[in-house]
Amino acid sequence: AQTSTSDTLAFSINNAYELPTMMGAGLMWNHNHQWKVGFDYTLQKWGSLGYPTYDAKNNEPWALRDGVYMDRSKFNLGFQYCYAENGRASFLKRVHYRAGVSYATPYYKVNGVDGPKEISVSAGFGIPIMNGYNNRSQLNISGQWVKSSAKDLIKENSFRINIGFTFNEDWFKKWKMQ
């Protein structure tokens, strides 16, 4: 025969998990439908969120505590060039060439120290996909180098390859029926 006993304490916290408020603004300059330069700023308000934590040091039960996270800022700068975005130019003149950089602050702490800041550089191109009724969709290919680092923490370098499709169809086009 086997017997067992257990002592279980249950703690519950209402509204324990929340998502941060996110605000952003951006500007883009378009020169002659060939050159585009854009800047974007995003702020995520992680610092105002409570997070359920257990204080093992003082043997306190689970409670919502502030100051676990920090507000996160991200700055992006991007550039695009396309010689002939719309038209019947040669294939290479219709390709969209892109490059960008970004910088982001962390939203979390590791052992009381700010987490890693992130810097990235990317470059890529958009290959036009054309058929009889659509000339605006693209196959997008890019490479991105990302460096994450923080004081007294691991430093990380990574390279990402991104492949995606952009379908710029006329979804709400008014068709004439005869």
Task: Provide a role label for each language-model segment.
Residues 1-178:
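Outer-membrane beta-barrel porins/channels
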